[in-house]
Amino acid sequence: MSERRDRVHPYVPEMQEQLRQGRVSRREFLRVATLLGVSLPVANLLAACGAAPPAAAPAAAPAAAPAPGATAVPAAASGAVTRGGVLKVGIQVPAVDHPARFSWVFDSNEFRQVYEYLTETGADNITRPYLLEKWEVNDTLDLWTLTLRQGIKWSNGDELTSEDVLFNFKEWLTPETKSSILGLWEGFLTVDNVTAVDTYTVQLKLDAPKLDVPETLFHYPAQIMHRSFNGDLTTLTNPGTGPMKLDAFVVGERVTVSKRDGYWQDGSDGSPLPYLDGIEYLDLGNDQTAYVAALQAGQIDTIYDPTVDTFLALRNDAALTVEPIATSQVRVLRMRVDQEPWTDVKVRNALKKIQNRESILEKAYFGQGVLGHDMHVSPVHPEYAPMEVPAYDPEGAKALLTEAGVQQPLDVAISVGTGWTDIVAYIETLAEDGKAGGFNITLDTMPNASYWEKWTETPVGVTPWTHRPLAVMVLPLAYIADKDGVPMPWNESRWVDEEFSTLLKQAQGTLDIEARRAIMKDLQAIQQTRGSIAVAWWQSVWNIYHPRFQNLSAHPTHYHLWREVWLDPSKAT
């Protein structure tokens, strides 16, 4: 009887040759090969050996222990994994209802141990199957076959099936849901082209080629809900596939989750995960100093997304672990192009010209980052095309305002959340430097929670945007419209450019990294010269926690992938 051979995408050997020639890096090879369905172990082998790739299994989830993408400390290094304990997290707790409408990463983190994803992009920016066992894609990247792991049980005892996956795609792709996920699929997929092949297999028939489908499935609002989902994940009644169950949700106060029985993955000790008894997410308000004090006092064990002030306060604390994370996280100063005077590109570009980027980075973020170029593609993105950093040019700004017929100084109020102290310092610096460029800038300050409520509505504001592993993931979220010309839900500036949208769709279906980078060069130039955003710098970020908790590993998007976190009693205090 012949051994079954699974199909390998024909671009994989071509890219392997590019790797051999030094045209792509090993990391770039691994990221693309795994997106095309090659399992990570096989992709590593191909990267190392340099021979023509053999027939290999498609991307497949590892055995139940350890979990996919886990970053567990080997038992030999830590003595032995122990069970028990409660992890306490300092994090704000806003109102939420439907996961597809999550606007912020911390929304998803507070439910991430209860509801899971079809795929998982690890701290290495490589995407692996999760609730999926594998995926396969055809030569032209427009037919994706998703195969679920069999035997995964919801907390109510039901089995995870294609019916659940179809339910979620319908939720995501229905405009009435108002999900940012819709922007990632716009022009590629409609709900009619999502079909169940059998109980465990779903096919996506796309209208155009798309490379980043597996990463799109890990967009943080894409938590998989049971087919009976009641529309409000805070009601404590919705089944989950995760290792914990939701016990309490109180806006502005806390979220508590606890270990459940029967989780589908085992730990290194052979028993079902998780190791912890539970996690408490505690809202300590808008002031980061409260979180610093609580961490130092042992009242919490880690802080979600610590600010640069928090980093500076804690970086030399010997009782804590401080880990830097390479990321594309950024503060985006955006102008609504559907409101005057921002309908005029000259006025938008004038605002960009009053950014003294070196001064902003030093004053707002104490030099902990790299300078930006007024476009939303980061140097950490593999398709980034290097650009010259724009200079501070107040005279050029005044000239543009004069050309636009704008009376000077131009009064501008910029909305900022005061809990983001670096954003406040950014706009304070901009206000001072902008005087010479014909601007009178004031800060419209509010608590972060208030900014979250109006972040897509305020005329001018600074919005924190989190890390995405590819630029072709973030750009369609914020800078395109639907087929009727209506800006997508997260297009907070309402900027839509036909040439930009056409090139972006081309980039999303381009396999060759060099070719994609060439397209990205044009996209970056378009956004820099006629776009709606200013990007002064890209942030360094940190993971800060008490080392008594093991496997509390850093993730560039601050995702809490914590199913294997455990409390080391030898380090407990």
Predicted regions and their residues:
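Structural transition elements
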Residues: 244, 370-403, 418-425
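Detector for C-terminal structural segments
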Residues: 14, 20, 31-46, 250-254, ...
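Ligand-site clamp/hinge motif
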Residues: 263-313, 440-442
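Ligand/substrate-recognition segments at binding pockets and active sites
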Residues: 53, 89, 251, 294-300, ...
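Surface-exposed binding/hinge segments that line
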Residues: 182-227, 248-250
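N-terminal lobe/hinge region of extracytoplasmic solute-binding protein
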Residues: 90-139, 170, 239
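A structural "hinge/loop" feature
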Residues: 91-109, 131, 158, 212-222, ...
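Gly/Pro-rich hinge or "lid" segments in bacterial periplasmic/extracellular proteins
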Residues: 122-126, 217-280, 289, 395, ...
